[in-house]
Amino acid sequence: MAQPIVVAALYKFVTLEDYVNLREPLLQAMLDNGIKGTLLIAEEGINGTVSGSREGIDGLLAWLKNDPRMVDIDHKESYCDEQPFYRTKVKLKKEIVTLGVPGVDPNKKVGTYVEPQDWNALISDPEVLLIDTRNDYEVSIGTFEGAIDPKTTSFREFPDYIKAHFDPSKHKKVAMFCTGGIRCEKASSYMLSEGFDEVFHLKGGILKYLEEVPQQESKWQGDCFVFDNRVTVRHDLSEGDYDQCHACRTPVSVEDRASEHYVPGISCPHCWDKLSEKTRRSAIDRQKQIELAKARNMPHPIGYNYKQSSSEA
């Protein structure tokens, strides 16, 4: 029986002044261990999701932890039957998660970490303002009970949303969460810089909560969007039933895929009447490349979804 693929989400805010020089040895470590996926490195730290065999993931983690700066790198795992990534990349960035506000640095100032087992008690406090820091298409398929949806399409929009809707003098306690912990960690640093006093964030993010909190005690509702070809995971971290529309990025349900407006790789019920002609042509061309690659048994182009392929068969 084939061993399951290990999917590891990892990040750490840590000052890496030599991050440019880290790119090539890190890429080689990924290749040596048979790792697929993308890691982002910047002066503020490292972030990404990768996949491989049990031995491969352990080998990469050992390589990272050999650097004293990354010995306690945050790391969460889930499993799937098919490789969710097709390429191996290390990218140099200005930020490992882009907020776009100069001076916000979780290495210098960050909110209070809340362990998954303590999260329910915190968000049950009526004085706590609970904010989902993810984008609208992620929130649409699952979130915590009572969470506020900022309806952002990019994390860059988060600061403007906070300034427009909340006042540090009125909102004393704020709790935030995101998929793996990185966005809310940076968001907490931003909110502290804006004068909010008590800022909390879920340590390890939604994925760690789903891993550690029994479903019968959970305050999570729905699936959790993930940034690989699984698209979503359920509460037990098994792969969900959603695909993703590669024209608009929106997760599409089984019901969505039964719609006359769903064309794999090209449109879905959420975007079929909103796409520009340029975007539509680009989606059609990409889908043709995917079909050609499949016919030739070649590596899949960017944008390919193996579940979408099997549903078409």
UniProtKB/Swiss-Prot annotation:
Gene Ontology process terms (BP): tRNA modification
Keyword list, A-Z: Oxidoreductase, tRNA processing
CDD domains on file: RHOD_YceA (cd01518)
Gene3D superfamilies: 3.30.70.100, Rhodanese-like domain
Source taxon at top rank: Bacteria
Domain (Rhodanese): residue spans on this chain: 124-218
Broad EC category: oxidoreductase
EC nos: 1.14.-.-
Active site: C178 (cysteine persulfide intermediate)
A molecular-function term among this protein's GO annotations: oxidoreductase activity, acting on paired donors, with incorporation or reduction of molecular oxygen
Protein name: tRNA uridine(34) hydroxylase
Gene behind the chain: trhO
